[in-house]
Amino acid sequence: MSDAAPSLSNLFYDPTYNPGQSTINYTSIYGNGSTITFDELQGLVNSTVTQAIMFGVRCGAAALTLIVMWMTSRSRKTPIFIINQVSLFLIILHSALYFKYLLSNYSSVTYALTGFPQFISRGDVHVYGATNIIQVLLVASIETSLVFQIKVIFTGDNFKRIGLMLTSISFTLGIATVTMYFVSAVKGMIVTYNDVSATQDKYFNASTILLASSINFMSFVLVVKLILAIRSRRFLGLKQFDSFHILLIMSCQSLLVPSIIFILAYSLKPNQGTDVLTTVATLLAVLSLPLSSMWATAANNASKTNTITSDFTTSTDRFYPGTLSSFQTDSINNDAKSSLRSRLYDLYPRRKETTSDKHSERTFVSETADDIEKNQFYQLPTPTSSKNTRIGPFADASYKEGEVEPVDMYTPDTAADEEARKFWTEDNNNL
């Protein structure tokens, strides 16, 4: 037996030689002369590995979010909690079925190169069909969440007609998206059961485009509506972190980013590995809703109401003007203050005050933690009360009914608060 090393090929000394362009000869359904380069083979392997990584990350992130939600949520029977739980469970189930698909012969390199149908078992086809059906249910849960947010943002709003119209459009678009995904899944299974090598790219592409369109449309509606609402609240001096801010964060994180990713998935070349962007967009849409809700709720628990336009400060257990020493002195400058604020509030149209305007409560942040789950929206405070007894956080413990005569208290901010209350409850058709 000779110990001499085998001679090296002349290509070893050629610096311009690319081994990735070397060909492999194998037998396929087209005969014995089938060839493939090492670069093409490596591309198939990289595509499978990339899909496995993305679905592994998706499964782990969804499972972790599901556990955290069960640990932190205080109310588990609200619609938003149920929708989030269903979406997370479906994304875990879909990822698990996709793992089975990746490990089956259907997704193997052998079948991709040779194309022999006898290499595919009926169990592999069943897993493929179940994966498509779970994907339909996942898209349905995402669309339900989007339509639910559209409904929530217009609940109790003065724009009832516009809100009903936009909710109907969103619902129709969501139904069309889910229907197209269902048609794509059924058509794909029918074709696959007859011929495992057949595909239905037309229906799948149409369903993905509809999903991207629905996300783009509903994100635009939510963001525009919420920006207008928050602008109005800031104009009134409300700086606390409430339901409008929570929904704005949810809409930005869970809708705008997936919209951009969906657009990139169709604008970039598929050979650059952009086919997994659709999976990333779906993951962000499912994860961001509960994560944003929990983060916003935690921020609310530590926040306090703070107003910009208030001229009052608290001293001991009573409520006194913060800058002047008496109500007589305050009344002198009140006309100038209310006049300036009235001109500012006149930037927005007003309507006649209704009876319900007199029963609004002061906004507190202690109940805001469950705001996103109960769909409750707080109102502006009533500056004065027609009753003798004072209530609220500034109630005087030493005050007894009947000790003083009923008087009409007029503070420096009475006129301004009246204008703010009118504006907040108005039916503003110009926004």
Curated annotation (Swiss-Prot):
Changing N132Y: Dominant negative mutation that inhibits the response to mating pheromone in cells that also express wild-type receptors. Induction: Expression is induced by exogenous alpha-factor. Expression is repressed by ITC1, a subunit of the ISW2 chromatin remodeling complex. The modification Phosphothreonine is found at T329, T363, T382, T411, T414. Changing R234G: Disrupts the interaction with G-protein complex and reduces cell responsiveness to alpha-factor. The modification Phosphoserine is found at S310, S315, S331, S360, S366, S385, S386. Changing K337 to A/R: Impairs internalization in response to alpha-factor-binding. There is a cross-link at K337, K374, K400, K422 (Glycyl lysine isopeptide (Lys-Gly) (interchain with G-Cter in ubiquitin)). GO terms for molecular function: mating-type alpha-factor pheromone receptor activity; mating-type factor pheromone receptor activity. The chain crosses the membrane at residues 50-72, 79-102, 133-156, 164-188, 206-230, 242-266, 276-299. This is Pheromone alpha factor receptor. It comes from Saccharomyces cerevisiae (strain ATCC 204508 / S288c). The gene is STE2.
